[in-house]
Amino acid sequence: MFIVAVHEWKPEFEITVTKEMIGGFNTLLENKQPLGIKLLSTHMRSDHGAFCTWEAPGLGELENFFKKFGPTLLKATKFYPVMQAFPATVEYELSLLKMITDLASK
């Protein structure tokens, strides 16, 4: 499952969040994260935020990872399960076919 995490923290939490990010990144670099959790990309914003794309077995597993390694960041994060549309994946193609058949049966 792919999950986009939208992080938006207040300026007064910048140092705390940065320390949590360092700890989390080190955990990932040392391959000590829970099985199946992978950070695919991080895009930083200039206004105390970031967008990250994760692969995880489920939303609960990713939230538990954040509870352990980034509790302050977790409070400033919204998670969105997503599906890769381009390049197209089998899951995306199947979702389109399902949508088409659902619309056709109405």
Located regions from the model:
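Short amphipathic alpha-helices in soluble, non-transmembrane regions
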Residues: 23, 62-71
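Short S/T/G/P-rich N-terminal loop/turn motif that feeds into the first structured element of a domain
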Residues: 1-49, 57-61, 82-106
